[in-house]
Amino acid sequence: MDPPAGAARRLLCPALLLLLLLLPPPLLPPPPPPANARLAAAADPPGGPLGHGAERILAVPVRTDAQGRLVSHVVSAATSRAGVRARRAAPVRTPSFPGGNEEEPGSHLFYNVTVFGRDLHLRLRPNARLVAPGATMEWQGEKGTTRVEPLLGSCLYVGDVAGLAEASSVALSNCDGLAGLIRMEEEEFFIEPLEKGLAAQEAEQGRVHVVYRRPPTSPPLGGPQALDTGASLDSLDSLSRALGVLEEHANSSRRRARRHAADDDYNIEVLLGVDDSVVQFHGKEHVQKYLLTLMNIVNEIYHDESLGAHINVVLVRIILLSYGKSMSLIEIGNPSQSLENVCRWAYLQQKPDTGHDEYHDHAIFLTRQDFGPSGMQGYAPVTGMCHPVRSCTLNHEDGFSSAFVVAHETGHVLGMEHDGQGNRCGDEVRLGSIMAPLVQAAFHRFHWSRCSQQELSRYLHSYDCLLDDPFAHDWPALPQLPGLHYSMNEQCRFDFGLGYMMCTAFRTFDPCKQLWCSHPDNPYFCKTKKGPPLDGTMCAPGKHCFKGHCIWLTPDILKRDGSWGAWSPFGSCSRTCGTGVKFRTRQCDNPHPANGGRTCSGLAYDFQLCSRQDCPDSLADFREEQCRQWDLYFEHGDAQHHWLPHEHRDAKERCHLYCESRETGEVVSMKRMVHDGTRCSYKDAFSLCVRGDCRKVGCDGVIGSSKQEDKCGVCGGDNSHCKVVKGTFTRSPKKHGYIKMFEIPAGARHLLIQEVDATSHHLAVKNLETGKFILNEENDVDASSKTFIAMGVEWEYRDEDGRETLQTMGPLHGTITVLVIPVGDTRVSLTYKYMIHEDSLNVDDNNVLEEDSVVYEWALKKWSPCSKPCGGGSQFTKYGCRRRLDHKMVHRGFCAALSKPKAIRRACNPQECSQPVWVTGEWEPCSQTCGRTGMQVRSVRCIQPLHDNTTRSVHAKHCNDARPESRRACSRELCPGRWRAGPWSQCSVTCGNGTQERPVLCRTADDSFGICQEERPETARTCRLGPCPRNISDPSKKSYVVQWLSRPDPDSPIRKISSKGHCQGDKSIFCRMEVLSRYCSIPGYNKLCCKSCNLYNNLTNVEGRIEPPPGKHNDIDVFMPTLPVPTVAMEVRPSPSTPLEVPLNASSTNATEDHPETNAVDEPYKIHGLEDEVQPPNLIPRRPSPYEKTRNQRIQELIDEMRKKEMLGKF
């Protein structure tokens, strides 16, 4: 960072100067501020910062042709044509590139942009399969107002970067400038206009864009994002070191090539719901472009090769909600209820006609409200795809990185579980798998795990709603061989860049084996990607490449799509009576598909209904006959059984044969489908099973018809011919045996038989025509509640505390007799009710009721919840279906034909609303017991007290006070560690006595800073080498060597100075300023100004009792004496004219060679004459006085002040 002008002439304050010394300069200046707040949000990384470490630059992209030549500065779709016309540029031929042959060549776009010193040539093609034909964007207002406009996706593009076709991916929109993702193998870029709404100004000098880059070693977007209730993982900083090799291997083995469209494509038609918080953040004028760009990225994620299936995410409808509706759907802090509200809302938006353009398979809801705990990004049911209510997800929108959240939650709905939770794919979590419990995927590093692929393949075939294609099949015919349109020179340019062409430096035996390319600047340096040229590439006059060989092309080897042949005649009927089916088939042989051609689309069979006449045995049950056939052939549990028909509860299993044992009641699958023409359900007399699938048939006998019978069996009737019959019979047991009560005629429907009072008797029913009992024979009474099939209909029998009930929807195919098996002499009373067509009534039947509503009726069930908890709301009556006989609530389907009463409205909760307040939960245990990363979290919610002593969560904006903190640091003490000593350094001298040093660090098991309780090992020691050689160069001169060894001394202790290494001198001229010496305790400043700080500490700490600051015991310690004393051999030469003097407080001594005197550190020393002469008696070094004076006035003042404090301390 350059200093501001005049900085040398002004005095900087110490704090500012310290920042100038310690802070590194920024990589680039920030972009200019936007014009308004809306632009400010757009200028930041999409949806907020991309995370710490994201770099940004300004760039001006331009539109080019396929060769990278400038076409226009206009990049927006709205003005691109005008820009080209303004320049009157000649038409430029823009051929399509490999992998993008879905559209006309003229629809491709090419852009050049320079990002961080790299010139990128973007090759784009329209993403024509993101927005379905007829898709709309709907604005739902506060008072039920709705505004609908067409949803256009004409400015959405996907593609790659030239030269990196297999290792790059681009998803951009050019609605208003370029916005979206540019992904390459090792890094990713986001690009968006610096300011929006300036497309009209592009033609003059281009348009400034912001480009963000995330390096491959940085954490993923926004850090790990919690999904569902996933547990936190290790930090990415530690993972980057441990997974470096694995990521390199994974990146090299996993290709991100864009998939070609396959015949087994699945299309998820999406309703995208957006609440008001998202609209307000992005702005009404920009939200549509943002949503299309976001979903374009989601679509690219589902096109990744690792998924193992080709799934298209197709937008059919976008709904933007008002503020009031948004607040009613999202319940703060309650993700389960919020998801239920969103799914219910999406279900209500569904179009009733499945053929409608806006009919959706799946709903995605985006919000910026905090619907769950802190960090929760999404919520979704598992395996809910195609379900009318459960196929929905709730997602927290937070910029383009939310694309991974949407993909993750939609993966749950498709049946995928979290990686590492219940499966064995935990090893793929750290590599950036989409279904990780925490979002760790990034645009340069993401994939679907092997478990996700397996779980998807397990369920995908059952999602029938994904099989239809919302797009019209009017695409242009694809070339039979792609190489027919590209020469080898063009393919070399696609592979290696501009200028490259086919290598001619050597002749290969067959040029179709591998494509070799070279540049004219170095024609003898040929390169290849070890792949052959495209099939159809011309390789010799009249010859073309095909499957790696240069051959003559003949019609029999070209790609050929299949086509259906003629239908065969209809075969025989599957049944002789009771309605069967007959089939006809066709073959895909006109012609057969060949050489990779498409197979025929559609079903290979067709069927018709046949043999519709009733069977002679009116009581025959076709499903029962199929089960009965196994009585003699199928043993279960080493025993034979009498098999009865059973209807499976799952509608998808009803065309598979399940039978129930009469002896044990056990239900067994016969592992086969029912015969064609079997009724799907006993509740539907017309729909039939055809090849394992239930085909809807109306009562009019038309396949696919929705026409139904009324309550008494009239097809399309209005119940006008229906009559209700009821009665009550009371009998007293007079003898043993059955007591006959009454008969119910054939044709009766909606039959209900019930005891008036609970008794010990047993109800029995007999088929009058066959004489066989269908319920409770005298010697075989089963009083347990059950559902069974008899006489071709399903019966429900219940015994509730001795009160028996029997009912069936009918119709009865024969008359039944109702009897009672008496137990005791208690009177028994039975009531019965049923509906029957008036033509089937007996003339003398006096129990006919004229009204149709005698069996069931609508009754008040409860009041709906109040629309407001306070401040005056409203609630409405909710009705349920009630049986008149006993006033029990039953399924509302029984009252479907009755007119429902109009709801009644009333006021509720008129009391005034209380002021919401912040409510905090208990702090959770600290995430760490020691170290520097411990954190505690707690829940913080805005709660509004209600009048009934309950509370509810509301939006944070309703609380006036400052939001309490939800995270805080904890347990930040250093962890226990152990001393680790390094190797000893070389001796400080080459001869004589010196010192050695070594680093001693306190480290924990994971090699982080720690605190050690044990005594620290020594960091310095003496070393003794051989005696130094004498000076024989000038015998007339005499030299003396004073050997001085440092050793701890209580009077002159050694001081510790913490640093990361030996001081190499000051690194800034500002270090000499005494006013900055107060910052020497800061490690960063001490390292920067180590020399000045050492001098300052030596002068101000005479006794050397400075202790290292708390928590800093992990640095390398360098031992230095408190006052400058010699640590190496010091040579003293006597002057010829003056007596020899030693300036170290020399005095007389009695030391001799035999009795050496000890010096200031109790180390024996000797004074050696270099020529064995007698040493001067006054050459004895003494301990220097700590009170010596200095010429520096300021330093002397500090020394005097310290001396005074020391003297006062002694007194």
Curated annotation (Swiss-Prot):
Domain Peptidase M12B residue range list: 266-470
TM regions (residue ranges): none
Active site: E409
GO BP annotations, alphabetical order: collagen catabolic process; collagen fibril organization; extracellular matrix organization; lung development; protein processing; proteolysis; skin development; spermatogenesis
Catalytic activity: Cleaves the N-propeptide of collagen chain alpha1(I) at Pro-|-Gln and of alpha1(II) and alpha2(I) at Ala-|-Gln
Domain TSP type-1, chain residue ranges per copy: 561-616, 854-912, 914-971, 975-1029
Pfam families noted in UniProt: ADAMTS_CR_2, ADAMTS_CR_3, ADAMTS_spacer1, Pep_M12B_propep, Reprolysin, TSP1_ADAMTS, TSP_1
Residues linked to a glycan: N112, N251, N949, N993, N1031, N1098, N1145, N1150
Annotated region (Disordered), positions in chain: 1170-1191
Keyword tags: Collagen degradation, Disulfide bond, Ehlers-Danlos syndrome, Extracellular matrix, Glycoprotein, Hydrolase, Metal-binding, Metalloprotease, Protease, Repeat, Secreted, Signal, Zinc, Zymogen
Gene Ontology cellular-component terms listed: extracellular matrix; extracellular region
Cofactor note: Binds 1 zinc ion per subunit.
Amino acids binding Zn(2+): H408, H412, H418
Localisation per UniProt entry: Secreted, Extracellular space, Extracellular matrix
Motif segment (Cell attachment site): 691-693
Disease: Ehlers-Danlos syndrome, dermatosparaxis type: A form of Ehlers-Danlos syndrome, a group of connective tissue disorders characterized by skin hyperextensibility, articular hypermobility, and tissue fragility. EDSDERMS is an autosomal recessive form characterized by extreme skin fragility and easy bruising, large fontanels, blue sclerae, puffy eyelids, micrognathia, umbilical hernia, and short fingers. Joint hypermobility becomes more important with age.
Function: Cleaves the propeptides of type I and II collagen prior to fibril assembly. Does not act on type III collagen. Cleaves lysyl oxidase LOX at a site downstream of its propeptide cleavage site to produce a short LOX form with reduced collagen-binding activity.
Record remark on domains: The spacer domain and the TSP type-1 domains are important for a tight interaction with the extracellular matrix.
Protein name: A disintegrin and metalloproteinase with thrombospondin motifs 2
Provenance organism: Homo sapiens (Human)
Taxonomic lineage from the root: Eukaryota, Metazoa, Chordata, Craniata, Vertebrata
Gene: ADAMTS2
